[in-house]
Amino acid sequence: ALAEKAASLMAAILGWTEQQFRELGKGKESADLALHLVTVLQGASLLTHTFNQPDLLLRETARLREWVNAL
């Protein structure tokens, strides 16, 4: 039950993120772009908490911001 709820939440986050890329005009690649963005954020969050190093998340979000702006 918990896994299903977590999957539902992540699906909603991915869906919303994909929609944002669609609104930016990214069309067919929107789902892949959304998956990349969410995957990087989740991984950075995990490592930030694991190593108790908030700067990891700050660095990755800065890189992602540059990446999105370059799209």
Predicted features by range, described:
Residues 6-13, 56-64:
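Extended, well-ordered alpha-helical scaffold segments
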Residues 10-34, 68-71:
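Hydrophobic alpha-helical bundle segments that form small-molecule/ligand-binding pockets
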Residues 1-4, 21, 25, 48:
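Short coil/turn segments at secondary-structure junctions
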Residues 2, 26-33, 53-57:
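Residue-level recognition of alpha-helical structural elements
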Residues 32-39, 59, 63:
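Amphipathic alpha-helical interaction segments
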Residues 16, 40-43, 63-66:
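Alpha-helical scaffold segments in carbohydrate-active enzymes
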Residues 1, 38-56, 69-71:
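Amphipathic C-terminal alpha-helical segment
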